[in-house]
């Protein structure tokens, strides 16, 4: 593939991420965010929170704002947990902007001691310590209701980190997140 041709211009940067030495090993054809934080706008409003999409537009959607919402929302006695799903750890780790293992000048680099990775890990530790994550370990390692998104439409879950693929289906399969036709379901980039 000649990456200098116009067909490949938009994806050259992404394709270059898969180089080792001077060789490409993957040709990227499309990029999508691996994770977004899905939320229910009605739940945000009912709890008096600013809309995360608006916070993002204003440059105020970050780890601190996200953490404050999670800590405030969570009430285990009422079965309210800020986070549910399988992907929040990966999403937050990747939002540090530093891969655990990277490539610099064509060589593998271990970034485990990078300060941004430590910051992301400490944030996740604090979230877990404060029980903001639905306790799958107490529920036979199943999601709430044993299905993705359960708890969003009922106001029991604040954020559901997942790929956009979860919302790209028919309304009958996205009902767990809320009523799409009423504009209840929204997503925001993973905070950083």
Name what the model sees in each region.
Residues 67-70, 105-142:
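Glycine-centered hinge/linker elements that transmit conformational signals in sensory
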Residues 177-192:
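Extracytoplasmic/periplasmic substrate-recognition and gating elements
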Residues 2-10, 54-58, 98-119, 192:
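Short, solvent-exposed loop/beta-turn-alpha elements that line the ligand-binding surface or hinge
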Residues 44, 65-72, 143-160:
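Short helices/loops that flank or line small-molecule/ion binding pockets
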Residues 42-56:
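Aromatic-glycine-rich donor-binding/catalytic loop that engages nucleotide-sugar donors
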Residues 1-10, 46-47, 151, 158-159, ...:
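Extracytoplasmic "Venus flytrap"/periplasmic binding protein-like
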Residues 18-37, 45, 62-110, 116:
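Extracytoplasmic/periplasmic solute-binding protein
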Residues 117-129, 147-166, 170:
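Glycine-rich, aromatic-lined ligand/substrate-binding cores of catalytic
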């Amino acid at each position: 593939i000649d990456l200098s041709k116009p067909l490949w211009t938009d994806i050259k940067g992404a394709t270059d991420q898969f180089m080792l030495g001077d060789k490409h090993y993957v040709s990227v054809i499309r990029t999508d965010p691996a994770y977004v934080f899905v939320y229910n706008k009605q739940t945000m409003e009912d709890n008096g929170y600013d809309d995360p999409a608006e916070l993002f537009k204003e440059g105020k959607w970050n780890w601190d704002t996200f953490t404050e919402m999670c800590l405030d929302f969570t009430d285990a006695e009422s079965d309210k947990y800020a986070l549910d799903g399988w992907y929040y750890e990966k999403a937050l780790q990747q939002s540090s902007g530093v891969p655990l293992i990277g490539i610099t000048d064509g060589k593998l680099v271990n970034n485990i001691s990078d300060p941004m990775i430590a910051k992301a890990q400490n944030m996740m530790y604090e979230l877990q310590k404060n029980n903001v994550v639905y306790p799958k370990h107490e529920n036979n390692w199943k999601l709430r209701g044993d299905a993705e998104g359960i708890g969003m439409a009922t106001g029991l879950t604040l954020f559901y980190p997942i790929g956009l693929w979860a919302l790209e289906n028919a309304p009958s399969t996205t009902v767990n997140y809320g009523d799409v036709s009423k504009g209840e379901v929204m997503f925001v980039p993973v905070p950083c």
